Amino acid sequence: MTFSICVREEYETERGDRHRRFGVAVTTRLPGVGTLCPFVSDSGAVATQILVNVDLGARGIEYIDDGLAVDDALQALLNADDSAPQRQLHGVDGETTFAFSGRECVDEYGHREGDHFTVAGNMLTGDAVLEATAEAYAANAVHDATDRATGPRAVTADVETDPLAKRLIDALAAGDLEGGDKREELSVQSAAVVVETTESHAVEPPYNDLRLDATETPIAALRETYDLAERGYRDTLERYEGAFTAGSLDEVSE
């Protein structure tokens, strides 16, 4: 039905400020996955899938925001859920990870946990989907490192790393190349990527919250949408250069 990845990255800006960012990327052979699966804040990231209960994701993030560890938060929700054997639930907080696949999930299903990320999927063509997704992300992770590719600098400076949203889409693409969701009879698909960070900018990147709710080519469509959003961000920064630091768009000539 679905495969997804949840990520935490800790990084330092060139000025020496420490920050965390969290992200989820997901795709499935059903429409509208972006309304159901990914839940992200500047404290954590959670994905809920297979027999979806959006309350698990929403309340999980609320608990994490309130200071609960992700494993305590999500396990408590599952303990109170009679349908837990049919759920997949995974996520990250500022310190730890958690991943759960109920025994009644549909084959092939499973999950992986890295030091600061989780991957889970069900109704897959095989375990290689999960492995490829995890390996593609891990190979390009920017964690415990200085990152110049944040905010406006990601599109206006010569930087070596890609924004997290793009790297999450690339991880989905790697899993999809291994077969992805096995239900080929379902042609209408969807995908989404959401990123939140403790770092703030006068103009926030629009590509950190993207959804394709109904398409036959979810990964390609999400990547194209990302590219357009990145270009639009760059164009906006160039067109209104100085306006946001000046404090008023009225000070920018048309």
Positions of predicted regions on the chain:
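N-terminal nucleophile
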Residues: M1-E254
